[in-house]
């Protein structure tokens, strides 16, 4: 088994390196690819020094079985044929192919079997906020069909990349030293001591691209007709996203039923005890694999409504871990 990482020097690429090692991913060889800027960079993996190769239109992928790609939608579109033409399976972390009818969009806890039907040799990894939500929705859907979803996300700076994290830290430093923020490049407004109710660009319907991803991707992954309305907000934490989720189901689900289903579901950890002020928070979920769920309660305005809070590391389960789990599923089912 020969595996590649495309975009090895990025935040998600680095997480791929850590996870492939941590999970003892079965492979004989790992090959790293990157842009001209990162080509030549060296990383250590399982005691061996690996050098990032320049991603080019050549036959480098001829003997590679699985490629984890995380170098942006433009790169994925440009190099998809080069990567897949000899049979390599491309597990893509970008938005390039997510809504293509002939590309499965997969979260293993929900629709792992979809990964086996890949006409173009490409499997798409969903958006981080979508992944985190559907992992929790699936066990509830198994009890009663979800008709409607409303979600507000609280997304950390790292969701916009490593440079965005650095900018947030720089903004705090500037506020302490001078009392004003001078560095605003990665966000539309100052993020320090602030929240920004915009992630990605606005669409003609008034929603942002990020919000429409949650609507479209949730329906595709879960094979559902559920309506989903999202508001995505950037907050001034560094890592891990959180979401406040409300659902309406065909039949009522009790709090106890929901808690039991979530606690038993793969990829979920229930953290829900108001008597001890115990609930998920970004500072406690960073670096962890599961999605943590709490504040489970009945909606006071709808007997078929349920609401809950979740938090999880969007770089792990929201990106690299989900892709690695897809790869593991393919190996088990080849």
Protein language model features and the residues they cover:
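Charged docking surfaces used in two-component/phosphorelay signaling
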Residues: 67, 157-334
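N-terminal Rossmann-like NAD(P) cofactor-binding subdomain of oxidoreductases
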Residues: 1-191, 227, 291-292, 296-302, ...
């Amino acid at each position: 088994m020969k595996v590649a990482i495309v975009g090895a020097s990025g935040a998600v690429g680095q997480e791929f390196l850590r996870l492939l090692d941590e999970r003892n991913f079965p492979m004989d060889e790992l090959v790293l690819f990157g842009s001209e800027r990162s080509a030549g960079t060296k990383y250590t993996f399982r005691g061996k020094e690996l050098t990032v190769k320049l991603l080019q239109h050549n036959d480098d992928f001829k003997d590679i079985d699985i490629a984890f790609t995380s170098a942006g939608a433009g790169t994925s579109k440009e190099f998809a044929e080069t990567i897949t033409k000899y049979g390599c399976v491309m597990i893509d972390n970008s938005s390039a192919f997510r809504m293509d009818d002939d590309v499965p969009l997969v979260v293993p806890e929900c629709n792992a079997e979809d990964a086996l039907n890949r006409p173009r040799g490409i499997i798409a990894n969903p958006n981080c906020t979508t992944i985190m939500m559907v992992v929790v929705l699936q066990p509830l859907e198994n009890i009663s069909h979800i008709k409607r979803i409303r979600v507000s996300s609280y997304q950390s700076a790292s969701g916009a990349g490593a440079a965005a994290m650095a900018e947030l830290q720089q903004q705090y430093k500037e506020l302490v030293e001078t009392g004003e923020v001078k560095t605003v490049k990665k966000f539309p407004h100052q993020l320090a001591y602030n929240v920004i109710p915009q992630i990605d660009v606005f669409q003609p319907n008034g929603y942002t691209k990020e919000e429409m991803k949650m609507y479209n991707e949730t329906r595709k992954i879960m094979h559902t007709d559920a309506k989903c309305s999202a508001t995505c907000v950037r907050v001034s934490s560094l890592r891990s996203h959180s979401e406040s989720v409300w659902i309406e189901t065909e039949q009522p689900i009790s709090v106890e039923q929901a808690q039991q289903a979530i606690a038993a579901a793969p990829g979920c950890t229930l953290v829900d005890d108001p008597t001890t002020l115990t609930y998920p928070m970004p500072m406690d979920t960073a670096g962890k694999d599961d999605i943590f769920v709490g504040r489970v309660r009945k909606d006071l305005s709808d007997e078929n409504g349920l609401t809950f809070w979740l938090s999880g590391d969007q770089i792990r389960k929201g990106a690299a871990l989900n892709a690695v789990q897809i790869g593991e599923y393919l190996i088990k089912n080849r």
